[in-house]
């Protein structure tokens, strides 16, 4: 497709030459200039732009350059489990995967590997995984292992509850923000985005967000809905029981707050509501919101368009986990099953 941009630009360049002594030459020059500018921008975003983005489709160059997958389809997972060391498994979505990070070594799971050389730390994470998917993927990758699993760290983000919502729940808990309707311009730009990386970048950063702004408000309402919340807690309980019964492993949940904006990060009461529900359920958890709130989103996110945790935020997560395990050393003790 990019060849077509070059061909059209050259065509207008030829017209400028052919019409140089004609009035239409000025129009040809204008069109040539516009085409040259557009083609240059297209070339930049298509071949040279390397910033990460919270929307996966806008970070193709970044992901192609920095995301390498192992034979298990994961990013430096360190599978299979060790049979000689106790295993610590970090499970989650894009935050565990290391979205926005250039090197896997910047992930908090790798920092735990450095701190606990006696443990084999496994990273199970891919963008888009929710709690139910994470449970299924844990079964897939760990299965009936002979390795001892001491601890599973489930990295939790505040959209995982959305998987539990039924159509009836969505009707009962509408978003406080009215949904925006797609216009003819939206359809036109979405179509053009299939053929232009420049249009795609501009539209999905500036125009598209308004179409999904209502989603976050509805997700937050699900956490306030006791029916949806209890259903979600039951999913977490099922996973905890799986770990205890099949692997004699403990579960530690690390709660990551929103980094999309400062106001979302500072919604302490919202986060505390779910933390209280976890505490009542007897879950062992670490909330990163109080720690992150003292720093501010600009120190924690990858960039303004990518609210994933940056290397500094990953270090804070690793430090919080290490501090928690220092205070509760029994968490890493693996029960030995007597034959």
PLM feature segments, named:
Residues 158-275, 288-294, 298-299, 303, ...:
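Serine-dependent acyl-ester chemistry module
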């Amino acid at each position: 497709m990019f060849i077509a941009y070059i061909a059209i630009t050259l065509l207008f360049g030829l017209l400028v030459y052919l019409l140089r002594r004609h009035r239409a030459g000025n129009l040809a020059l204008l069109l040539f200039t516009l085409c040259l500018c557009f083609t240059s921008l297209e070339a930049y975003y298509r071949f040279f732009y390397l910033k990460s983005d919270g929307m996966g489709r806008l970070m193709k160059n970044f992901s192609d350059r920095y995301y390498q997958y192992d034979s298990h389809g994961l990013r430096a997972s360190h599978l299979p489990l060790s049979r000689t060391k106790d295993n610590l498994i970090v499970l989650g979505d894009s935050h565990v995967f290391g979205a926005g990070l250039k090197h896997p070594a910047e992930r908090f799971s790798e920092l735990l590997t450095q701190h606990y050389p006696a443990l084999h730390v496994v990273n199970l994470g891919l963008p888009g995984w929710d709690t139910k998917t994470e449970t299924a993927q844990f079964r897939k990758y760990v299965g009936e292992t002979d390795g001892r699993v001491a601890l599973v760290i489930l990295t939790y983000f505040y959209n995982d509850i959305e998987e539990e919502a039924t159509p009836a729940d969505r009707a009962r808990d509408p978003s406080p923000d009215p949904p925006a309707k797609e216009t003819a311009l939206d359809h036109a730009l979405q179509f053009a985005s299939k053929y232009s990386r420049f249009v795609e970048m501009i539209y999905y950063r500036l125009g598209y967000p308004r179409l999904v702004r209502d989603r976050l408000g509805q997700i937050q309402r699900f956490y306030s809905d006791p029916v949806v919340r209890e259903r979600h807690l039951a999913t977490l309980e099922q996973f905890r029981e799986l770990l205890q019964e099949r692997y004699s492993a403990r579960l530690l949940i690390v709660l990551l707050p929103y980094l999309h904006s400062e106001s979302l990060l500072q919604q302490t009461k919202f986060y505390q509501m779910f933390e209280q529900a976890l505490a009542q359920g007897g879950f062992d958890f670490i909330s990163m919101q109080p720690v992150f709130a003292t720093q501010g989103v600009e120190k924690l996110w990858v960039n303004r368009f990518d609210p994933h945790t940056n290397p500094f935020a990953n270090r804070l997560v690793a430090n919080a986990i290490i501090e928690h395990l220092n205070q509760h050393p029994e968490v890493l003790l693996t029960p030995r099953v007597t034959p």
